[in-house]
Structure formats: structure tokens, C-alpha cells
Amino acid sequence: DGFEVLNVMERKHLIEDIPVIMISSEDSDVYVRRAYELGVSDYISRPFDAKVVYQRVFNTIKLYAKQRRLSTLIGDQIYEKEKNNRMMITILSHIVEFRNGESGMHVLHINRLTEKILECLVQKTDRYHLSYSDRYLITTASALHDIGKIGIDDKILNKPGKLTKDEFEIIKTHTLIGARMLEDMEVYKNEPLVKMAYQICRWHHERYDGKGYPDGLKGDDIPISAQVVALADVYDALVSDRVYKKAYSHEKAMEMILAGECGTFNPLLLECLVDIQDTLQE
């Protein structure tokens, strides 16, 4: 019957996009109320006037057309805002990379790696309850992971040789510098993107066994956003040329990460890295 059709449409989320007008000889309040609860746009009881029905159908279609145009307009505006956000984040992160003597590809690589790892993770488990919006925010905010390096002395940042213990302690402060920069943005600090970027900036050098920095967080006390970006950052650092080292091959980088030479990572994320490794060299 009509209610069964409405139930099917609701289960398949069709009722949100297709206007439904129900015509029935039933006119009890319970019957009509149930129809509206299931998502009908209008309810017409028999007997009816054909001209009135025509006008109500016409008005319903006209209303849905307006709603669709409005949704498209809002969608376009949101897209433009997100595009501008991404552009400004990319520009800012490239400034940091330029100062760090890098090519600018690191941010792009981190972005793509983060996206791929997250895609794999949500297929493996719902443990972290990551929505599409969450994954988008993490991927976008990943570009700002090293923004704190803008506060580190060039001589240390671009030193070709091994860092001294004191120099390494200074380098480690880039996590706190980046987090503080974002925290100091009073107007925007509660924006979801800024809050996500804060997590990543501060904790992308933490390790799953608690031996990372700056706070020595352990396991899932480390936000999953920072865990994912940490793994992406380590892999890309290994396979890229740096002022202090030559690039390792993909095979060697994977061997080092899986052997724990770069710290301990979430086993689920390591599984994801292995699963997507065929696409990594692209």
C-alpha cells in the first residue's frame, strides 16, 4: 500500500529528494498524521476537485524546485569557502616549507597520504567514528602540521649535519609553537578546522607507546587525527631528500617503519599503510 511505498522510500532516503503527494479516501487524523510523519509533502482526501489537485501538485513541484536551487546555491558558496580555506592553508604551509628548504611537495604528499590512510581506516573499523566531515577536516588540517617551524632558527632548521642534543630540543618545540599560534587566534580558535589543526600541530610527534613528544601521550590518548598525520609525516620524510639525508626507497622506508625504527604506531594504522602501499609511490 501507500505506507509501504513511503517506508521503502524513507529507508532508501528517496523521500528527501522526491516530493510525494498522497491521495486517499481515508481522512482520519491518525491516518493523515502517519502520512506526514513518513515524509509526504501533501495529503489529499477523496473526493477531490481535479483543478485543486493540479494546483497543489504544481505548487509542490514549484516549492521543491526553489529548494533545490537554494541548496545548489548554498552548496556552491560552501565549496567556494572551503576552496579558499584550502588555498590559504596551502599558501601558509608552503611558506613554512620554503623556509625549511623543502620543495613544497611535502604538504601535498601528507595531504594525500592522510586521506588514503583514513579511507582505509574507516573500512577496517568504526572504532573512531570518523564521519566524512571528520576525514575532510583532518586531511585539510594536515597541511598545517609543521607550521610551528616558522618559529625555529634557520640555522637549526636547515642544518645539513646531525643536530646536537640542545638543537634537537629546540626543534621539538615546533609542536608547541604551532599549537600556541593556533590557540592565540581568539576569533577562530573554536572553529572545527582550527581545533583539528591544533591537535595535529601539538601531537603529530607523539608515539603509540608513549615515547613521543611534547606530552608523552600513549595509545588512543593521542587523537586519531595526530596519529594518522604522524605516520604520513614519517613515511614521506623517509622517502624524500632532506638537507641532512638522501631519500630512502619505498621498500626501505616500509621496513624501517614496520620494524619500529621511527617509533611505535597504532597497529591498525600500520595495517592500513601496508594495505595502501601499492598506491604510495604514485
What spans do the regions from the language model cover?
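Metal-dependent catalytic cores of enzymes that make or break cyclic nucleotides
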Residues: F3, R86, E97-E282
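Amphipathic coiled-coil signal-transmission "stalk" helices
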Residues: N59, K66, L70-M88, R99, ...
